[in-house]
């Protein structure tokens, strides 16, 4: 449904996105994670037609949204956007949520019903006449989410939706994201500084580094089989050892400074690799009691 093909974006001669490519299917939750300044917010703004790419293409349902002006307006109406710092008007909650509906020419009677329904979805039923600017940060973010969802978008874009929120508000927003996707089938693309939030919520994760996706995969793939040393370090793997692939009794092993570690991954002999070792992958036993088992790695140690 959403295709990113070599998307580039520069500001004042500095390239922020240097060829971002990915495919997001209808009904998926796609998380964009990456270091600060990696271009996560820029990418979402390009998808939402708030900025224009320097190069490459963004296609939604096969339409290049930045090349086809006639289609861009129609496509934009298919999308809702929630920003990191939600902007609310100095009026009631109901008036804030109704803005997009009025732009679309919806009749007042229908607007009232849709606003009430949207507030119920985000857990703010009865808030219609509250002044929006008197709400807490978490409540404001839920109002922003209701405002985005009241237009019934096919695609929901969320830029750091839980940044600076307290843990209770974070949990409520995360529950809403899952429920909206599950119940309405909405395609959701969100950026986050919290990589574990991506792990909890997303079907696919894109790790944005150095202007490109260094890896796109399921949470399990990204966190247990990182595509590079850089990705491994970013997702929190600290024990990374360099080695060279060697043949070992008909199987593959990695020679890491004299210690051979067997691997199930299909590797090519003499290939230089990096081993990512997690504490949960290790078992410690006293040296005198250590036993060897076929296919298991046993490392020598002292009492």
Locations of the language-model features?
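Catalytic Walker B motif of ABC-type/P-loop ATPase nucleotide-binding domains
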Residues: 156-159
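ABC ATPase NBD coupling module
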Residues: 65-80, 103, 222-226
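Glycine/charge-rich catalytic "coupling/switch" loops of P-loop NTPases
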Residues: 258-303
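Helix-to-loop junction immediately C-terminal to a conserved catalytic motif
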Residues: 48
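Conserved ABC ATPase "signature" region
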Residues: 102, 109-127, 178
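Conserved ABC ATPase signature
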Residues: 131-135, 139
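Conserved catalytic motifs of ABC-family nucleotide-binding domains
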Residues: 152
